[in-house]
A protein has these predicted regions:
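Short surface loop/edge beta-strand patches of beta-sandwich-type extracellular domains
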Residues: 14-23, 70-93, 154-160
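Short tryptophan-centered beta-strand motifs in secreted/extracellular beta-sheet-rich domains
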Residues: 97, 166-174, 183
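Extracytoplasmic low-complexity segments
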Residues: 6-72, 256-261
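C-terminal motif of bacterial Sec signal peptides marking the signal peptidase cleavage site
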Residues: 2-4
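Flexible glycan-contacting loops in extracellular carbohydrate-active proteins
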Residues: 194-238
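Glycan-recognition/cleft segments
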Residues: 111-144, 200-202
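Extracellular, beta-strand-rich glycan-interacting domains
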Residues: 29-38, 94-103, 230-260
Length: 261
C-alpha cells in the first residue's frame, strides 16, 4: 500500500482497509478527522495524505484530536488515480471544516486545488488581513474554463465571529447550476454571491496534490511552476478538524447536520 510511505513511525500499527476493487460512489471525496495523531484520509476514495514533517496534533479537537498548524507546517493530499479524471471536471464543490484560530496578521492559506502553471490555484480558500479581532476576511479564488479560458473569479467574504477560543464550523459551497458560492458559519448561511456565467467548475493543469493549510506556492517544492514562496503569504497556524471535500452541492440541511454532528 502506497500510503505506508507516509506512515508515522511513532505510530506504525496502522490497519489498512482492504480494497474491494469497486469504485466508490460517495460524493465525499476526502475526509480528514485527524484523530489518534493519524493524518490519513478516512474517506472511501483514498487520497494519499502526508504532511511536510512538521505537523502536530492538538488534544482538544471538536471531536477527538485536531490538526495543529504552524508557520512551517502544511498537508498535501495526493489525488488517487481513480479521481484524476474527476478533479478537472468536478462541476460543484463543497469544502467544510472546523477551525479555531486567532486574528491573522498576514494572508494565510487554507485550501487549494492547485493549478500547476499559474500563480494562483484553480480553487483557493485563504484568509486575508482584516482589522477586526473577531471578523475573518476570507477570499476564494477560482480559475474556471467557461466560454473564456482560465476565467478568473474572486470572492471576498467578511464573516463575523470567527476568531477566538471557540471552534467554528465553516462550509464553502459552489453551485455550478446557479453559479453561486455560499458560505456557512456554524450551520447557517451567512454569505452568498453569484458569479455570473461561471457555470460548472472545469479546471486546467490540475496539480497532483491538494494543499491544506497552505497556498499552492508556499509548499516545498512549490505545487506550481508559476510561483515560489511569497513573503506576504503564510501557512495556516491555527487548528483544523474534520476537513471534508465533496464534489456536490451540500444543502443547508446537510451542512446543519454536519455541524450538529
Amino acid at each position: 500500500c502506497m500510503q505506508s510511505c507516509f506512515q508515522d513511525m511513532d505510530h506504525p500499527a496502522f490497519d489498512y482497509p482492504e480494497s474491494t476493487g469497486e469504485v466508490p460512489t460517495t460524493p465525499l471525496k476526502m475526509y480528514l478527522p485527524f484523530d489518534e495523531e493519524d493524518i490519513r484520509d478516512k474517506g472511501e476514495w483514498g487520497f494519499l495524505v502526508a504532511d511536510n514533517g512538521n505537523a502536530k496534533f492538538a488534544e482538544d479537537g471538536i471531536a477527538g484530536m485536531a490538526y495543529q498548524g504552524a508557520e512551517n507546517a502544511y498537508i498535501l493530499a495526493k489525488t488517487p488515480s481513480i479521481l484524476e479524471n474527476n478533479m478537472p471536471t468536478i462541476g460543484d464543490l463543497t469544502v467544510a471544516f472546523w477551525m479555531r484560530t486567532t486574528k491573522n496578521t498576514s494572508a494565510q492559506g487554507l485550501f487549494s486545488i492547485p493549478n500547476s502553471i499559474k500563480f494562483c490555484g484553480n480553487f483557493d480558500i485563504f484568509l486575508e488581513n482584516n482589522n477586526s479581532e473577531t471578523q475573518a476576511f476570507f477570499k476564494v479564488h477560482i480559475f474556471n474554463q467557461t466560454a473564456k479560458e482560465n476565467d478568473e473569479r474572486w470572492v471576498e467574504a467578511k464573516i463575523d465571529d470567527i476568531f477566538g477560543s471557540e471552534w467554528v464550523h465553516l462550509a464553502f459551497v459552489y453551485d455550478g447550476n446557479t453559479s453561486t458560492i455560499t458560505v456557512y458559519r456554524n450551520g447557517e448561511g451567512v454569505f452568498t454571491k453569484e458569479l455570473p456565467d461561471c457555470g460548472k467548475l472545469k479546471f486546467n493543469n490540475v496539480g497532483a496534490s491538494l494543499a491544506v493549510g497552505a497556498f499552492q506556492f508556499s509548499t516545498t517544492p512549490s505545487l506550481t511552476s508559476g510561483a515560489g514562496a511569497q513573503t506576504w503569504a503564510k501557512n495556516f497556524p491555527g487548528q483544523l478538524d474534520q476537513f471534508r471535500l465533496y464534489d456536490k452541492v451540500l444543502t443547508a440541511t446537510e451542512i446543519q447536520s454536519i455541524y450538529s454532528g
